[in-house]
């Protein structure tokens, strides 16, 4: 993603526009399905193998099979300073990190706001593998190349953007109440009980497979990965064995709803646009990078991009912040704000009568319609932030990732709310639809509507 000499940088873009929020609102938005099939191309993952409702349910009733080989960005970091680089950039501690361990790594800006997160694997001495969304990868790659660390990186882009037409690793996930029995059948023995985020090695279809106990939706599950060329044989064996357990392959439509099920904010606004110490990064990053071309949307209409940033505490990552590990990017800001009254991440369950009013609102021609509600996922912008207020109209937080969960028979969102309004069972109101002051050529003209919602746990399956 490094800047080519003839390409303007993100900093050039920021210097040329009057307001970044307005610019991001004007970026292309609208098609949820288009985004899903871009990240999981249809020649590899069907939008639906059966139907998205049964595919959502499988993780709770039988087994869900997720093919994760195509949509995530991967960065390999090799060299004697590999761990030192990540220790410098992330909030995590690495004192017990080593081969066959992994971390949920979180990278923050110097002022303590989240840039991105991902899973960091230690594959061998001095060899790490970071897997996740693109924003955090660009920051890691920039620092690997410019920070004076003795490392080399290999960029393995998601499939639709990958010049090699293949990935280094296949990556599958099996999850559901029958997943332990399936894994025992595939490997010939019960899966060993190992601590969270520890890797183990098993044999499936005669191939060595790296496995990690991991959940996408709060149920028993394992991530399985290995060399790309071994993927078809392993996949065939898993699918064949899964037939006895009514395992369902999960298509791209249902797959991306798992973030709501898990309560994971998969695409926070990356906190890269404003801090002066990150100017060199913005000069390195091209204006064509996703951070500049993805779209902002929703009813939350704040004037500054900083208003869309999250702290790691707000996203539920407080347990991985290790302030006592020494210096790292963002440490001073996080230490200074540690005792603050942080907003809290929750689930918001929409009132079904109000959901019906949204749909009723675009039936007929007698008035300006409500904003179209797409099922099962309606985040029509990359960063979709809807405003949330209390019964007196006071702003109390944001609502993101609108998703219909067949597992809950409910329309839900992830909320990040002021702590005074985050108690389970609290009633709040969110606003669905863009403000009339913002006209997008990618969205139909529509009116806003208020939606009552009830605060529930995140992950929502805990309610």
Q: Which residues make up each language-model segment?
A:
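Conserved, structured C-terminal
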Residues: 1-35, 39, 122-463
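Acidic, proline/glycine-enriched N-terminal capping motif
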Residues: 1-104, 115, 345
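Short, charge-rich binding segments
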Residues: 96-98, 107-113, 118-124, 163-164
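Short amphipathic beta-strand starts and helix->beta connectors
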Residues: 54-61, 107-117, 202-212, 396-398
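Short secondary-structure transition/capping motifs
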Residues: 71-78, 109, 119-121, 128-133, ...
